[in-house]
Regions:
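Active-site microenvironment for binding and transforming phosphate-containing groups
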Residues: 1-119
Length: 119
């Protein structure tokens, strides 16, 4: 944790076919209300700081920043299949992927993300 980033892992998911993690807010560059590791572009934070925070997390976890795909929560019914053109507008509450490589993410506050996997 030399970079200050902490990622929580569930013992229930360890050893399975998927890598998983739940990053804490430590180790980032954002300031003020969104201080430290803010990963969301939609909450008024400096866009460059969010990009750098995402890059820090990617380096910490060993994946390419371009592989990170996250939901754009709108409390709707749209699902995006990673690799296909983004919907217009690019708003969707679900992600589907049928190939290895992409890192899928979801933001959650009072909403609970539901994660399914089929190796």
């Amino acid at each position: 944790m030399a970079d200050g980033i902490r990622v929580l892992r569930s013992p229930l998911l360890e050893g399975g076919p998927f890598v998983h993690g739940f990053p804490e807010r430590t180790g980032g560059e954002s300031q003020g209300l969104r201080a430290s590791l803010n990963l969301g572009y939609r909450w008024g934070d400096d866009q460059e700081l969010v990009r750098r925070n995402r890059a820090r997390l990617a380096e910490h976890e060993g994946f390419a920043l371009d592989d990170l795909q996250v939901t754009k929560h709108v409390h709707g019914v749209n699902v995006w299949k990673v690799g296909e053109p983004l919907p217009d507008p690019p708003e969707f509450d679900g992600l589907v992927c049928d190939r290895p490589g992409p890192v899928l993410g979801a933001f959650a506050a009072d909403c609970v993300p539901i994660l399914f996997g089929d190796p």
